[in-house]
């Protein structure tokens, strides 16, 4: 993010617009609507500026002279819209010297702020900006928003503004107030206002407020949410909805940073991720924290990579909630296995190659992975091994000891579904060495089975870090061959 979005209160403030053409008229009109006192600085005004001057007496003034350094003194904001390179640069340099925010129309390099495209439903305002990179795209997005937001949303926002102090006094707890307003904006009160029945909507709001005061403070709740394999676009609608309503989030290391950006901005963030035996919080303490936070009335988001019930200890966590009578919801996610297989072009099953798929863990017990406990293995099945990267060499050796040939195809898919995705191909004999050479890091899945050989043909997604010549890494000694 190269620009910090902000709304300025300019009511009664002196603002300068340097220029006398159509662009200057547009910018001056926007500032006047925000309540600013505007000075147009230009030797001559074109017709749009003259018309604006005629319709805005008292708040818009014209200085019929060229801009000179010093005119900006005391201004809250300056806009350069002369279209003249030398004048615009003088405006920019003069304002920079005094620390005055300045924007030169169409010149991001001569601007300390960007004027966004606006969707005005006053007092509700939306702003869309590309940071000057793609203004046409920003306008198109704003146009779509215009069609999605009825003008009545302004009336709804004004009603909320009138009632805000009364609600604050009636419901002193901020989390309680948040839930109340969510109930209002999602319910019949808002629908009435949007339908033009504002008095009816206000009456419904007051009825719900009285009802809310009469009940005890709302109980907390836990949302156990599967965040999917990494790509934020793979979140479910329900997951995103609950992420936007959470008061606090406990998140795993596997949840990509981009996913956390989608959680409600005001929510407290608590990292509880695990990495190769190093736990930010032990599992027992995570279970306790979920109960403690919910009992404090919080809506707690437990954000887990992949699916919470697939090697995610989701069952352990909800057992504790059930014992303590804490309400909860479980939202499944696309599993890491599904995401990695789909984005790597390695089918979990295929009519010609693999009729079954097994999901296993490569965790060690007594110092060794327990692959032998799941034998026998078939050559016409796909194995997805979670947490197998750190013990990869031992995992491959044990699979061979259980009867799979050393030439059996195998792959590691790291950072699946993200721009950092990497796929390393080999077989049970060569994979561990290739992964070491490539310095692959977790999160990663190990995939073993004949469908691995389909990656060069079906691997549609290439991460920025992935070797584009990955097809060459398939060991030619594997005898299964590819079918046309």
Swiss-Prot record:
Keywords linked to the UniProt accession: Cobalamin biosynthesis, Lyase, Methyltransferase, Multifunctional enzyme, NAD, Oxidoreductase, Phosphoprotein, Porphyrin biosynthesis, S-adenosyl-L-methionine, Transferase
GO MF terms, alphabetically ordered: NAD binding; precorrin-2 dehydrogenase activity; sirohydrochlorin ferrochelatase activity; uroporphyrin-III C-methyltransferase activity
Region of interest (Precorrin-2 dehydrogenase /sirohydrochlorin ferrochelatase), residue spans: 1-205
Catalysis performed (reactions): uroporphyrinogen III + 2 S-adenosyl-L-methionine = precorrin-2 + 2 S-adenosyl-L-homocysteine + H(+); precorrin-2 + NAD(+) = sirohydrochlorin + NADH + 2 H(+); siroheme + 2 H(+) = sirohydrochlorin + Fe(2+)
Binding site for S-adenosyl-L-methionine: 229, 305-307, 310, 335-336, 387, 416
Database matches in SUPFAM superfamilies: NAD(P)-binding Rossmann-fold domains (SSF51735), Siroheme synthase middle domains-like (SSF75615), Tetrapyrrole methylase (SSF53790)
Claim: NAD is one of the keywords in the record: yes
Active site residues per record: 252, 274
Pathway this chain belongs to: Cofactor biosynthesis; adenosylcobalamin biosynthesis; precorrin-2 from uroporphyrinogen III: step 1/1; Cofactor biosynthesis; adenosylcobalamin biosynthesis; sirohydrochlorin from precorrin-2: step 1/1; Porphyrin-containing compound metabolism; siroheme biosynthesis; precorrin-2 from uroporphyrinogen III: step 1/1; Porphyrin-containing compound metabolism; siroheme biosynthesis; siroheme from sirohydrochlorin: step 1/1
Binding residue positions for NAD(+): 22-23, 43-44
Pfam families recorded: CysG_dimeriser, NAD_binding_7, Sirohm_synth_M, TP_methylase
EC number, as in UniProt: 2.1.1.107, 1.3.1.76, 4.99.1.4
Biological processes, Gene Ontology terms: cobalamin biosynthetic process; methylation; siroheme biosynthetic process
Region (Uroporphyrinogen-III C-methyltransferase): 220-484
Modification type Phosphoserine: residues: 130
Keyword S-adenosyl-L-methionine carried by entry: yes
Disulfide bonds: none
Family as reported in the entry's similarity comment: In the N-terminal section; belongs to the precorrin-2 dehydrogenase / sirohydrochlorin ferrochelatase family.
Known function: Then it catalyzes the NAD-dependent ring dehydrogenation of precorrin-2 to yield sirohydrochlorin. Finally, it catalyzes the ferrochelation of sirohydrochlorin to yield siroheme.
Descriptive protein name: Siroheme synthase 1
Species assigned in the record: Halorhodospira halophila (strain DSM 244 / SL1)
